[in-house]
Amino acid sequence: MNTVADNIVSLRPDPVAGQAIGEILVATGRLSLRDAQRVAAEQRRQGQKFGEAAIGLKLLTREDLDLALSRQFEYSYLNVRDTSRSAELIAAYQPFSQVAESLRALRSQLMLRWLQTNPAHKAIAIVSAGSGDGRSFIAANLAIVFSQLGQQTLLIDADLRDPRQQALFMPEKSAGLSAVLAGRSGLEAAVAVSGLANLRLMPAGASPPNPQELLGRPAFSALLQDAAAEFDVIVIDTPAGCDYADAEIVARVARAATLVTRKNQSLLSEAASLARRLQDSGVTLVGAVLNDA
């Protein structure tokens, strides 16, 4: 083995937090050992940081460097060249965008107003009155920004009628929530999301003929109790609140909800009506989102 290269990188099968940036770049295939050697020589010659020297030699792009730095500091996001997931996962693909910053602001509000007020407060249902308001978009990206904070995060797709999280994340095959509620699976139906540390997804699973009845079973409450023992945050996607009572059932079990509206689309009267029904059911409304994405 090349002993000069050995002084630059210590090869490991997978990049892990705490590795030197050069080690991560080689382990992820962004740099070869030979190129890493060239960068190290240029780094010493110019007195630059390793990443800046690599960019100067045109061996890396700024995007490559940012992705490696995110792994070094345990801040997971996805390479834009990875098209296996939906571009709607803005917090994963564009973590430094204004939209992602707004999602982090929402995260802070939810932590201050709910999650940090009581150790038992783990779950938040994402609700809206109508279809197309962006519930699934907000739920998915909110789960991502919680996971980027180092919180063990579970995203549950409780929209058993028109689920979207499976299409957004394209995870490994899972029995899904419907199988859990039918008693055929358990928390193992939550699968890891590759590339995004600290995040697991429980997709909706097969569409049942009786979604409202399934969600109303004690099994859903038991699932959230089991999940609360393993996760710091549980984000739950729901169907449109004015079309079905499913969202209210989910929010009652979660005990907290965030209301999503879309600019120039959502009807204020419908959103206000849903908010009243939730509050009358004992649900704490923690945060509201005007979705302009």
Positions of the model-derived regions?
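P-loop NTP-binding module
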Residues: 2-46, 57-79, 83-293
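Helix-loop-beta junctions that constitute the ligand-sensing/allosteric loops
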Residues: 47-51
